[in-house]
Amino acid sequence: MGFNEFLSSIFGNKSTRDMKEIKPWVEKIKAAYPEIEALDNDALRAKTEELKKYIRESATDERAKVEELKASIESTELEDREEVFAQIDKIEKEILEKYEKALEEVLPVAFSIVKATAKRFTENEEIVVTATEFDRHLAATKDFVRIEGDKAIYQNHWNAGGNDTVWNMIHYDVQLFGGVVLHKGKIAEMATGEGKTLVATLPVFLNALTGNGVHVVTVNDYLAKRDSEWMGPLYMFHGLSVDCIDRHQPNSDARRQAYLADITFGTNNEFGFDYLRDNMAISPKDLVQRQHNYAIVDEVDSVLIDDARTPLIISGPVPKGDDQLFEQLRPLVERLVEAQKALATKYLSEAKRLIASNDKKEVEEGFLALYRSHKCLPKNKALIKFLSEQGIKAGMLKTEEIYMEQNNKRMHEVTEPLYFVIEEKLNSVDLTDKGIDLITGNSEDPTLFVLPDIAAQLSELENQNLTNEQLLEKKDELLTNYAIKSERVHTINQLLKAYTMFEKDDEYVVIDGQVKIVDEQTGRIMEGRRYSDGLHQAIEAKERVKVEAATQTFATITLQNYFRMYHKLSGMTGTAETEAGELWDIYKLDVVVIPTNRPIARKDMNDRVYKTKREKYKAVIEEIEKLVQAGRPVLVGTTSVEISEMLSKMLTMRKIEHSVLNAKLHQKEAEIVAKAGFSCAVTIATNMAGRGTDIKLSPEVKAAGGLAIIGTERHESRRVDRQLRGRAGRQGDPGSSVFFVSLEDDLMRLFSSDRIASVMDKLGFQEGEMIEHKMISNSIERAQKKVEENNFGIRKRLLEYDDVMNKQRTVVYTKRRHALMGERIGMDIVNMIWDRCANAIENNDYEGCQMELLQTLAMETPFTEEEFRNEKKDTLAEKTFNIAMENFKRKTERLAQIANPVIKQVYENQGHMYENILIPITDGKRMYNISCNLKAAYESESKEVVKAFEKSILLHVIDEAWKENLRELDELKHSVQNASYEQKDPLLIYKLESVTLFDAMVNKINNQTISILMRGQIPVQEAPADEQQPRRVEVRQAAPEQRQDMSKYREQKQDLSDPNQQAAASQDTREQQKREPIRAEKTVGRNDPCPCGSGKKYKNCHGQNA
């Protein structure tokens, strides 16, 4: 007995402890169930209303206190409001805690209500209840409810995901276990076919009773729509509203209503993008989301782990892109790649000839030539085949060790004759001097593709005898040239990666003239995802499709940081146990394995290992043929579109009928999966993860041995392999699974084949022979663990980088939301004024202080130089702040006084014609047209005009500063990688530098906002001296208020699995290319179309405040 087994025998394993903790809850539910089941239909529904009332009343006093504090805000001095808002925030947290306690108390009854309802729908075709207003509203839009007199009749069948569904499910005890786990904010791991969708109904129903909203998150829109239709009637029967955000257009009233529903279904991407859109809104009417209360994430491992490297980005166009550069440099790269291919072939031929020699020196030269061929093109199929021969790979690895000794001391001898060097494990391509010479050719500038040492050049300039003007001019010239060269070198590198490391129909497909990334985990097309840092444009140039223009990031967030905003988060999946450590480290989510309702009868066989891919695929086809003859259905899992199409051709040649499900044919998914369990059916599918549809078997198929799973390759992640195996053996069905592996597979080639190859060599295995042993399967699993650890390191590192931005984003978005909603804007402005006063005194001498107070706060210094030197800085800051606040109040009152007669006149004479009014306000430099609701302005005696001015300026200043900050952070992330050469941690440097950038941004926001607000005045047209007419303010009718149209912003998931992003996550990655920030060189004209895509002119949209 091992030590771990010994400990488990004393303390029990985790699974046993989890079950022990949850079992009492299940017993309470079972005890409450008979009483609930005995209720009639109306009493059952009344019980739900009773629970809602109990939960709401648990925090009655706290809610009353919040309302009282909110009512007191208007009469509270601006300076004292911060304390009031802090009290409100504290009490709102207490309310959530009270609700959580109440939910625990009613859990057994609530779960019993759901189970009793499921039973009634299963046993009755129709359920008759007394009709409520909600039922009548429902009957007008849903087919499964009809009204007859004062009765509402619910049917037990409805349409879900395009199929007619009859409800026939009642919760098992293990599903009650799962429901408790989800309510507790944990991850429930349940095997395929155990009814995860049904389990979710329990915690969703319970948490929806608070009225704060529950989000059910799925991986694709088909599942989101299907599950909302499938489970919806169960909730609606109890008066809970259900909607799905993917049914409605972004930024629409319908989508806003979907978020106001008690239960909201949707995809992870859309929830994230709606959050970003809300933080770009220019009016409260544009907001769709409310507080992030409780989310249940389906296929939680896919969302929180596989997609974690992929931030959501909303970007807008920049006037000038670098797409032309990709087209211009493509022929040079093609010439380079062809030259390298010829070189790789030459070295391989040379290696084969020399290694066959009996001369020891020639054999050594042969292995050097082989190693050079490997460095040229590691994915060369002829090379991979030769490496699988006995003793060849081991010989090449010995050669590699020799040249890598003493920190790669002799590596230059290997790489000098090559045009570029590929490091496959590091995902990097480096040009050599020979490669640079080839692409420079007869160019006048031999350094066309060589980055100069900019620091040395700038230092040289300082030593020259130049005037300040000349020095600045020369510096500008140097920096401009460096930027141009940097972009050129970067483009060449990205094109090289596109040609040598990314294969069509493997990493991506080309459909309708567009390059679309294929998700390596699921085989699905990732719509809207683009590789970052110009790599996607490079692939577009390679495939000769339209190269999309460059864009600038307007808003971004990772799914990790989005989901961490929820008050409570839980998830369910069939495979999370292998990633339990990561889910706890990053999200503090505990994984609980729920036992199956019936024991699993699937037979999982050892891996079958072959030397070459050719032998492996031949064996796969023979195995399929044998299984089909036995009358069993077969599901063949592949890792790429290319392999699925190749196997399809091989089966067609053998005249075996089959279906193919891959990224190119995903439209037929439901139809193909529905038939996959028929006798003799053969289905080839790129990884089935997240398909969300069970393969049901007929009695004849079960008798023949059930569904057979064949994996054609081990995936990098054990979890994806487990997902594929899990398609067979659902709910105790028979089945089998086996993986066919070759030493040429990517996982084996890069991480594991050395040991297995040497074992096969020693045992004298010949081509065509197969090895099957537990030791081999364990060795492959160790390789997978190695890759998983590496990927976890990358994700954790990326999250550490994003955490820096996330803290900044939280501050900026909070400030922006205050401005948008208007409630706390006064408090923020007071803080800004204090900050400016304190800064002016803290960071300057007396003259500097005078200048800053004049420039920012438009005020004279209220103390003498002697007082400045002798008095405490806090005292001076307080004195300055008090005077600044008096000035500010006086100016805002004056603004309202000037606007009010005009507002009064327009409202009383033409109020029925206008809803909004445009008021011109200037700070002496620029004119701002402020849109304000005419009625609100009239009723507030133009105080609303001042609020609208403050809000417009703050939103405008924050948005511009945040965009610029995102750009600078992106550039910083790339530039800090060089710190590793100085034995410094790039992340630490990034954190320190980002604080400096953030402080500069906050100062900029505060300075600009206060400067404009302090100088803001309505321009008054003076009457001519000889005419006795009053002064006149010019106002205009504003366009009717519209919701912000964001339909033409580009939403994308930036793929962080590409090398450029991994660089930021791995310190030992080779030297990275510096990324130049995207330069918005051309400004948008006032009469040009607005870049947001609304179709309106810039001056009438985002340019209103500009």
UniProtKB/Swiss-Prot annotation:
GO terms for molecular function: ATP binding; metal ion binding; protein-exporting ATPase activity. ATP binds at residues 175, 193-197, 694. It is a peripheral membrane protein. May bind 1 zinc ion per subunit. InterPro entries: Helicase_ATP-bd, Helicase_C-like, P-loop_NTPase, SEC_C_motif, SecA, SecA_CS, SecA_DEAD, SecA_motor_DEAD. Its cofactor is Zn(2+). This is Protein translocase subunit SecA. It comes from Bacteroides thetaiotaomicron (strain ATCC 29148 / DSM 2079 / JCM 5827 / CCUG 10774 / NCTC 10582 / VPI-5482 / E50). It is an enzyme of class 7 (translocase). Transmembrane segments: none annotated. Monomer and homodimer. Part of the essential Sec protein translocation apparatus which comprises SecA, SecYEG and auxiliary proteins SecDF. Other proteins may also be involved. It catalyses: ATP + H2O + cellular proteinSide 1 = ADP + phosphate + cellular proteinSide 2. The keyword ATP-binding applies. SMART domains: SecA_DEAD, SecA_PP_bind. PROSITE patterns: SECA, SECA_MOTOR_DEAD. GO terms for biological process: intracellular protein transmembrane transport; protein import; protein targeting; protein transport by the Sec complex. It is found in: Cell inner membrane; Cytoplasm. Keywords: ATP-binding, Cell inner membrane, Cell membrane, Cytoplasm, Membrane, Metal-binding, Nucleotide-binding, Protein transport, Translocase, Translocation, Transport, Zinc. Its EC number is 7.4.2.8. Belongs to the SecA family. Residues 1057-1067 have a biased composition (Polar residues). The keyword Translocase applies. Part of the Sec protein translocase complex. Interacts with the SecYEG preprotein conducting channel. Has a central role in coupling the hydrolysis of ATP to the transfer of proteins into and across the cell membrane, serving as an ATP-driven molecular motor driving the stepwise translocation of polypeptide chains across the membrane. The gene is secA. Zn(2+) binds at residues 1090, 1092, 1101-1102.
